[in-house]
Amino acid sequence: MIKLFNTLSKRIEVFKPIDDVVKIYCCGVTVYDLCHLGHARSYIAWDVLRRFLIYSDFKVKYVQNFTDIDDKILKRAKEESISMKEVSEKNIIEFHKDMDSLGIMRPDSMPRATNHICNICDLITILEDKGYAYSRDGDVYYSVFKNQNYGKLSNQNIEEQNINQQGRMANEENSKKLNPQDFALWKKAKDDEPFFDSPWGKGRPGWHIECSAMVKDELGDTIDIHLGGSDLIFPHHENEIAQSEAANGKKLANYWLHNGMVNVNGQKMSKSLKNFKTIRELINSGISPMTLRYFVMTVNYRKPLDFTEEALRSASEAWKNINVALSFMDLTKGSLNSIDKNEPIEEEYKEKISFELSQKKLKFSEALGNDLNTASAIAIIYDLAKPLKNFLNQFQRVEGFKIDQNEKFFLLENFKTLEKLTEVLGLKKEVLVKESKITEEEISTLINERLKAKKEKNYAKADEIRSLLKEKGIELIDQSKEITTWIRV
């Protein structure tokens, strides 16, 4: 049984699919820049959901869009003196690099807004015909007050909003609206902007209608699960519901799941606070992709994730132990990869081990089935890794170390279970780095020398110190010009 917290009902519900194939839509990125830690948090959570559904014998169709026309993309195109399409294409390539590095499965379909203009126009026309939309001088707006259910996802009170927003109709766009809360379905093109032809003239779609059109075209009128960050609940997802359900006359999604936001040292991650972390920066700073993935999964997907040096270091150490266990067959050089048929295993012992491992698999499924409790699932993974790592410590220390067939059976079955369950979490074996014997005091001394070299603009020496520490298994993370932290890898 899988239970999920449904933002729509505000409670945990047992998941019941509509039919044989679970239809999932996830709001994708606006492709104007590199992905950040918030994107990693979101897409890792939904990757675990997808993997767990497949592990639980569900068939899944997973769709995630690209928003490839937007004010931010147009702004970036002007800044770089390239076309909107070039900005989008470049960042879609970088998106795939980041997601692939984190072990995130590629969606079954990744539609782009610009390829769905006809569907978008058709949907807007239906809304006009049904009286939910109106046009004003080349723009088209959704009339929020025509929809009595508006606000059901976010608990927004549009009557109160209307009172609060009275007098804010000064700018040109708002002056065209019947009410301040009405939102754009189609925007009239400005002189210097790319455009698409439509029944209302040259222009481009609003952000919200893009997703409604792509959901309908890719998955149909009603889907099982709609995913996104909690920052999308209002207005984006609220507006999606309003558009789709008004046009189609059916419920858009049965389950709405939203992940929590990312903080850095207790503060909201933002460019203005200069604590903004891209996935690429974090990996280039020495944090391994699987360490990052493991770190994200240590906290329930609905809760805020606080990125701190201490939490990251703890995740790095924990993942290192699991990674060693996943390297079990490599480190034993295949010497334990089979059971000696001439020395049979006690049947009673085999049954005991098989039962114990089946119980761990059951608890693993119960953990993830309890609203994706990845922290509890990881605890089971760690429990499986522990005897493998303990054995390896003895095996590598004692020459000619031998074990009986019972223990060999236990270790091999434990390893197989570990491999299978880590795959559900998307954790994959990474190349092992020899552990360093350098002390924390020595590391601090070298970091201070490097900071001094950087202040003196002696970048060659600074790079030399970074390389020296890297050779000793220490990766430096530059938090700012004055602050450098480190992790063992």
UniProtKB/Swiss-Prot annotation:
Record carries keyword Membrane: no
Q: Which residues bind Zn(2+)?
A: 27, 211, 236, 240
Q: InterPro entries, alphabetically? A: Cys-tRNA-ligase, Cys-tRNA-synt_Ia_DALR, Cys-tRNA/MSH_ligase, Rossmann-like_a/b/a_fold, tRNA-synt_1_cat_dom, tRNAsynth_Ia_anticodon-bd
Tell me what this protein is called.
Cysteine--tRNA ligase
- Where along the sequence does the record place the motif called 'KMSKS' region? 268-272
Please give one Gene Ontology molecular function term for this protein.
zinc ion binding
Q: Which CDD domains match?
A: CysRS_core
Q: What is its EC number?
A: 6.1.1.16
The UniProt family comment states: Belongs to the class-I aminoacyl-tRNA synthetase family.
Co-factor: note: Binds 1 zinc ion per subunit.
Domain of life according to the entry: Bacteria
Q: Which Gene3D superfamilies match?
A: Cysteine-tRNA ligase, C-terminal anti-codon recognition domain, HUPs
Q: Which PANTHER family match?
A: CYSTEINE--TRNA LIGASE, CYTOPLASMIC, CYSTEINYL-TRNA SYNTHETASE
* CC cofactor: Zn(2+)
The answer to whether UniProt assigns keyword Metal-binding to this entry is: yes
Q: Where is this motif: 'HIGH' region?
A: 29-39
Q: Where in the cell is it found?
A: Cytoplasm
Keywords of the record: Aminoacyl-tRNA synthetase, ATP-binding, Cytoplasm, Ligase, Metal-binding, Nucleotide-binding, Protein biosynthesis, Zinc
Question: What's an example Gene Ontology biological process for this entry?
Answer: cysteinyl-tRNA aminoacylation
List positions binding ATP.
Answer: 271
